[in-house]
Structures are given as structure tokens and as C-alpha cells.
């Protein structure tokens, strides 16, 4: 089976590696153009491009996937399947219609829930107890195509978006492997999504990390996990931005105004919310590294009675 692979960030790398390991004929890899990276702003390759070059696979980097020249190139390759994993551009109908056996997408949610750009973050922010990977046949909509396979994953109440991202990379690759096997055999299932049950996972932005202490301790805990490592949760302490990296919901209440620092100890900062007390265990002050509160207070003071935010 001849495959064209389209993907860009590190979450797509295990999927490409799995296709290489399974000895499919890879006609080419399509990835986003090189971008300036680091302080020197030198052009850097995407993780997918690096893997392709290591394996002597031709690489294509269209600025726009709808350009006629690029579409003609993919047509000339004549793939049986196009596999898309976090490519970063919307594919036009002309490309979706090229492969004989379809364009296959690996999406890191249990569709139709959490369509869109940031499902890993939003399942945690919303306090979901499970998520998963869905493979599907692509159509012109945003993650609306017919589903092939699903793999469910239970969510620990303390898992962060970064940890879940790393977990899903490998689960996605295994689900893709099974999907491609079924497609090659002609046995791939095809299930229409229930479009009435959909939800969206919009792209993340920095303001999402701003903690609102008038919410429940559990909601704040979920936010802190869901925006870790990016865009990261934050509040203000004495008019200075304080990033919040790790929290715990305590089985105790407070009558203080929301956001009030109730107590500071080696265990962390106790803060009042609309219901339970939230323990902030790890913070980061401007121009400093991340630190457990117990370490930070050895050389710095955090005052009780002050209100965060």
C-alpha cells in the first residue's frame, strides 16, 4: 500500500515511525515550511521532516496546500492512502479526492466530542474522566468524517496536558497501525458521526491560563493541569505575575474572600475558592525557574492574607 504522510509536530512522529516500521511504501512526507527557532532565529525543521530525512523519504513543504502546483504533485505520486496527523493546514477537496482508499486522519479525542485544534487541553480543563484516539476518513468539515477505529484512555485526575500528549502519541500510532491493516484488507469499518453530540476544542491562547478564584477548587485544578505546559496557568501576587504549575484540591473549606492566601507552609500555599481550599504546590516567579513552594519560601516570603489575582 502506497502512502503519503502529512504531519508536522512531535505528536505526529510516532505515527510516521510506525508506518516506516510496518514497511509500507512511503511516497513522500508533507510538512509545514521550516520556521525560525531559538534566539538566533535560524530556520528549524519540523520533527516530522527530521524523521523523513533520516529515512531518505522525499519531503514537500507547501506554503499553501491548496496551491495547484502542490495538488498536481500529490496527484502525480498517486497514493493509495494519505495519512494526516496534525499537519497544520486545511486540505482542499482536490487533495481529499486523490487517494484511492481515502485520506485518513488521526484525531486525539473520542469523536464527535472535542473536534478542533486542542482536544488534549480541553478534555482536562473540562474534567473529563476518559478520552481517546479516533481514526477517520477525512471530509471537507473540521473533524467531521466517518470514523474507523476508536481507542479509549482513562484519565487520572492529576494528569497534565503535557503528560497526556506524550501518552497519546504512542496510542495514536498503534491505532493508526490497526487502521491501515484493516484498510489494506478491505475490512475497515465506517461509522457516521452523531453530529448532534459534537463539541469543539478551540485553539489555546495565553489568556486562558488566568486563574479565576471564584470558580471551584476542582475547576481551577483542572485548568492548571490542562494548560500545563502551555500556555500555563497564572495569577498575580503583589502585582507580579506568578505562574502556577501544580495544585491539589483539599478536603477543607474557608470563609475568606476567594483568592485569599490562608496559609503558607513547606507543603504549599493554601488559597480560598468558591468551595474547597486549593493548595498551590509549585510556582514560578518572573525570571525564575519553576520551584516547589517549600523551596521558594526558604529564601522568599509569601504573605498570608493577601488576595491573588
Swiss-Prot record:
Reaction it catalyzes: L-methionyl-tRNA(fMet) + (6R)-10-formyltetrahydrofolate = N-formyl-L-methionyl-tRNA(fMet) + (6S)-5,6,7,8-tetrahydrofolate + H(+)
EC number per UniProt: 2.1.2.9
An MF annotation (GO) of this entry: methionyl-tRNA formyltransferase activity
Keywords associated with the record: Protein biosynthesis, Transferase
Metal-binding recorded as keyword: no
Keyword Protein biosynthesis annotated: yes
Record-stated family: Belongs to the Fmt family.
Protein known as: Methionyl-tRNA formyltransferase
Lineage: Bacteria, Bacillati, Bacillota, Clostridia, Peptostreptococcales
Amino acid at each position: 500500500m502506497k502512502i503519503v504522510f502529512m504531519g508536522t509536530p512531535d505528536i505526529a512522529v510516532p505515527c510516521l515511525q510506525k508506518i516506516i516500521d510496518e514497511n509500507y511504501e512511503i511516497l513522500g512526507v508533507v510538512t509545514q515550511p521550516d520556521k525560525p527557532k531559538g534566539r538566533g532565529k535560524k530556520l528549524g525543521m519540523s520533527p516530522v521532516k527530521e524523521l523523513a530525512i533520516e529515512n531518505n523519504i522525499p519531503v514537500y513543504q507547501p506554503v499553501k496546500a491548496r496551491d495547484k502546483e502542490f495538488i498536481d504533485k500529490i496527484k502525480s505520486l498517486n497514493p493509495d492512502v494519505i495519512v494526516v496527523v496534525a499537519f497544520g493546514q486545511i486540505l482542499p477537496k482536490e487533495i481529499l479526492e486523490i487517494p484511492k482508499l481515502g485520506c485518513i486522519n488521526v484525531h486525539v479525542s473520542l469523536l464527535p466530542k472535542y473536534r478542533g485544534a486542542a482536544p488534549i487541553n480541553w478534555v482536562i480543563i473540562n474534567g473529563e474522566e476518559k478520552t481517546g484516539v479516533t481514526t477517520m476518513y477525512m471530509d471537507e468539515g473540521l473533524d467531521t468524517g466517518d470514523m474507523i477505529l476508536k481507542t479509549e484512555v482513562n484519565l487520572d485526575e492529576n494528569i497534565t496536558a503535557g503528560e497526556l500528549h506524550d501518552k497519546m502519541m504512542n496510542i495514536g500510532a498503534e491505532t493508526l497501525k490497526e487502521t491501515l491493516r484493516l484498510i489494506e484488507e478491505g475490512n475497515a469499518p465506517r461509522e457516521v458521526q452523531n453530529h448532534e453530540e459534537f463539541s469543539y476544542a478551540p485553539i489555546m491562547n495565553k489568556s486562558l491560563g488566568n486563574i479565576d478564584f471564584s470558580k471551584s477548587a476542582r475547576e481551577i485544578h483542572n485548568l492548571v493541569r490542562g494548560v500545563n505546559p502551555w500556555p500555563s496557568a497564572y495569577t498575580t501576587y503583589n502585582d507580579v505575575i506568578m505562574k502556577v504549575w501544580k495544585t491539589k484540591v483539599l478536603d477543607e473549606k474557608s470563609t475568606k474572600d476567594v483568592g485569599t492566601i490562608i496559609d503558607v507552609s513547606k507543603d504549599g500555599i493554601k488559597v480560598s475558592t468558591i468551595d474547597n481550599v486549593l493548595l498551590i504546590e509549585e510556582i514560578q516567579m518572573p525570571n525564575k525557574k519553576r520551584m516547589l513552594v517549600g523551596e521558594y519560601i526558604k529564601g522568599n516570603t509569601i504573605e498570608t492574607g493577601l488576595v491573588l489575582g
